[in-house]
């Protein structure tokens, strides 16, 4: 289902969604999103997706510890990316942590936030 974007309507401001991951290209995506936000007078939403791990589900305590560690790592990655955006453009991005399939979580965040008007993904320029 497609939701009408409201980012440029009165009372709304455009937002750019940037996916924060562990790739070297992520810094370029954060850079672009921060500069875009300044240029259009918008905001940035930073998303970190924790992929659900089906292993150790029968060991509930182990799964809980692994989940807590994944959330700590996600917060640390968002701290770094938010700090970079703030240093580049003096903005404070919104931070979102989701669990599950990355593609589905990206689509879900876009669907639920009608102010998101751009998705920034960084890509390698190499042969990988």
At which residue positions do the language-model features occur?
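Charged docking surfaces used in two-component/phosphorelay signaling
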Residues: 97-105
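A short acidic, amphipathic alpha-helical/loop segment
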Residues: 32, 108-109
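Glycine-rich phosphate-binding loop signature in dinucleotide/nucleotide-binding domains
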Residues: 109-116
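Rossmann-fold cofactor-recognition segment
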Residues: 92-95
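A short acidic, glycine-rich active-site loop
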Residues: 63-76
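Glycine-rich, Arg-bearing micro-motifs that act as flexible, cationic patches
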Residues: 118-128
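Small/aliphatic-rich secondary-structure junction motif
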Residues: 5-60
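Conserved acidic residues
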Residues: 14, 116-117
């Amino acid at each position: 289902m497609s939701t009408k974007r409201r980012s440029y309507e009165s009372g709304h401001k455009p937002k750019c969604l940037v996916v924060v991951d562990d790739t070297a290209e992520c810094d370029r995506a954060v850079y672009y999103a921060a500069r875009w936000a300044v240029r259009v007078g918008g905001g940035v939403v930073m998303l970190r997706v924790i992929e659900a791990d089906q292993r150790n589900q029968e060991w509930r305590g182990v799964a809980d510890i692994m989940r807590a560690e994944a959330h700590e790592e996600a917060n640390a990655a968002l701290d770094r990316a938010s700090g970079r955006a703030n240093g580049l453009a003096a903005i404070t991005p919104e931070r979102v942590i989701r669990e599950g399939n990355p593609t589905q979580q990206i689509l879900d965040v876009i669907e639920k936030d009608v102010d998101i008007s751009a998705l920034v993904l960084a890509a390698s320029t190499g042969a990988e």
